[in-house]
Amino acid sequence: MSNPAQRVPPPTRLPGLITTPLSWLYSIGINHKNRRYDAGQGVARLNRPVISVGNLSTGGTGKTPMVHLVVRMLQELGHQPVIAMRGYGAKPGEKGDEQLEHEQAVAGVPIVAQPDRLAGLRSLFASVTGQSLDVVVLDDGFQHRKIARDLDMVLIDATRPPDRDALLPRGHLREPLRSLGRADLVILTHTEQLDQEEIGELVRRVSVYAPAPVLTARHIWSGVTQYTRQEHGWSAELIPLDAMASKRVYAASAIGNPQAFLAMARQHGLKVVHHHQLGDHAAFSESQAQAWGNAQTQPDSPPLLMTRKDWVKAEKLGSWGDGVRVIVPELSVEIEDVERLRIAIQSVCLSA
């Protein structure tokens, strides 16, 4: 495989003469903010243990399936968790793509989705329904330091090594590398795209900045669900992965790291003949749904491939047309030393 350091795509087309000083100004702001939080200013502690799942860079690290994994672990340990998130990309009065995905994946788990997560959680805990909730999972919580946490998990996309990256807007980093010193646990994601030598090298490089344990995780497809548009809605059919080999597909995405998504598709033998890419969290339009539907009226036309994060938004569009097929991978995360994560979670819940 190629060196993962070479896989970091350019985050911006703006010339370095513009982005370099902007990144420098950004670093001044983030360093000032972190110094205040390090001193405990503006940090509140809840009367429940808090587990944060976050990252060092902009989107695409795999936070959502990791949140689901943590929530299920907590449930297996007998806890009743609540997910707290900002609700990025959601219109007023509507649910965002990540909230909808959470609701499908971990049905019944309460979700606080608002910019002021602290106020939302306090309001929930003061209610009758919130009394039994005993642990908080912060989705994208590494930079949301207003809430003290008992376990700070930081995800790093192995295909975007942070020591080969730069601060926003010149690069993808939301914080400098030294911020990894706050992490209690670092998890390298998307390692299925690296060989063992590359993984070992990256673990060593990350460990220079992170005194915490560094685990590795693979994103896997357990199968795919094919949704077919019918007169009164969508029908769903679970299809085994081996049936997808050599299948031609169109792809559409509005996610943080679409290249990782496309790479996984190709690893499973799918032939991506076209990719329609939008910005992270962007909404799909009725005209786009109509165009994709019209394209599938042709003989032997390929189905559309989408992540579940995109599908929860797109399925509500009304212009698809009958007979349209959309393929959605069932994504999960495998952690190499998963017992270490389980012990960390259990320890936090017992001691908090």
Q: Model segments located where?
A:
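Extreme N-terminal, non-catalytic leader segments
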Residues: 1-51
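C-terminal accessory "lid"/substrate-recognition subdomains
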Residues: 2-6, 161-302
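Walker A (P-loop) phosphate-binding motif
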Residues: 34-90, 192-193
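Hydrophobic residues at beta-strand termini and immediately following loops
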Residues: 53, 112, 156, 217, ...
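Hydrophobic alpha-helical packing residues
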Residues: 70, 74-75, 102, 206, ...
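Phosphate/Mg2+-binding loops and adjacent switch elements
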Residues: 79, 86-210, 216
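Short, flexible loop segments at boundaries between secondary-structure elements
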Residues: 222, 278-283, 322-352
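Acidic beta-strand-to-loop metal/phosphate-binding motif
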Residues: 303-309
